[in-house]
Regions:
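A short, exposed loop/beta-hairpin motif centered on an aromatic-Gly-Thr core
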Residues: 25-35
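A short, charged, amphipathic alpha-helix used as a generic interaction element across diverse proteins
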Residues: 33-51
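Short, mixed-charge low-complexity intrinsically disordered segments
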Residues: 50-58
Length: 58
């Protein structure tokens, strides 16, 4: 299944990201960023830091 991060500007002028897998949105930023680079930095954090994150039941 192909996965793609998308960066986009919302209607308020803030930058956001979403992760698509097989055409479905499986994750999103949940918040807007003032700059495109801020949203891109958040994507890099998710890509680099979550691969071995534990799953905790709440």
């Amino acid at each position: 299944m192909s996965q793609t991060f998308e960066l986009y500007e919302d209607s308020s002028g803030e930058w956001r990201w979403r992760l698509r897998a097989g055409g479905d949105i499986v994750a999103d930023s949940g918040e807007g960023y003032a700059s495109k680079s801020g949203a891109r930095d958040a994507v890099e954090t998710v890509k680099g830091g979550a691969y071995d994150a534990p799953v905790e039941e709440q």
